[in-house]
């Protein structure tokens, strides 16, 4: 074990989702969020599933698609300061296993939420809007695109 030795990555954001156990931790955190929401007595099952989906997608959108730069003092801060975490992930390569996992997980959660809400129209619209808001920025066509100048700087 090398104590005090710096990591070899110039920008740790590029490889964080490929770390050991990160996918399992992600799934456990989503499950924990769902259990915490289930423990609130006045929420029905459909409301809990919709809230789990919406909170998950909101957190994913904020952390992957709005926060830019790196949380570390890195030599490449000049390059990474204008890129979101999603754009930095896997050095910008598309269709890597981490990107596929983070694209499929909201879809799976959406399908579960739709099933457990029994396809109720109000829940369905909320869950669909939430899914689209988090899936569209992940498309390769939106890499580096800032709609209406939002989050440009």
Curated annotation (Swiss-Prot):
Q: Does the keyword DNA-binding apply?
A: no
Among Pfam families, the record links this protein to:
ORMDL
Q: How does it sit in the membrane?
A: Multi-pass membrane protein
What's the main place this protein lives? endoplasmic reticulum
The reply to whether Endoplasmic reticulum figures as a keyword in the UniProt entry is yes
Which InterPro entries does the entry link to? Answer: ORMDL
Q: Which GO terms describe its cellular component?
A: endoplasmic reticulum; endoplasmic reticulum membrane; serine palmitoyltransferase complex
Q: What residue intervals traverse the membrane?
A: 22-42, 43-63, 106-126
Q: Name one GO biological process term.
A: negative regulation of ceramide biosynthetic process
Q: Where in the cell is it found?
A: Endoplasmic reticulum membrane
What is stated about domains?
Ceramides bind to ORMDL3 N-terminus and stabilize it in a conformation that physically restricts the accessibility of the substrates to their binding sites in the serine palmitoyltransferase (SPT) complex, hence inhibiting SPT catalytic activity. In the absence of ceramides, the N-terminus is flexible and permits substrate binding, thus liberating SPT from inhibition.
Whom does it interact with, and what assembly results? Ceramide-sensitive subunit of the serine palmitoyltransferase (SPT) complex, which is also composed of SPTLC1, SPTLC2/3 and SPTSSA/B.
Function description: Plays an essential role in the homeostatic regulation of sphingolipid de novo biosynthesis by modulating the activity of the serine palmitoyltransferase (SPT) in response to ceramide levels. When complexed to SPT, the binding of ceramides to its N-terminus stabilizes a conformation that block SPT substrate entry, hence preventing SPT catalytic activity. Through this mechanism, maintains ceramide levels at sufficient concentrations for the production of complex sphingolipids, but which prevents the accumulation of ceramides to levels that trigger apoptosis.
Q: Which family does it belong to?
A: Belongs to the ORM family.
Q: What is this protein called?
A: ORM1-like protein 2
Q: Which organism is it from?
A: Bos taurus
Originating gene: ORMDL2
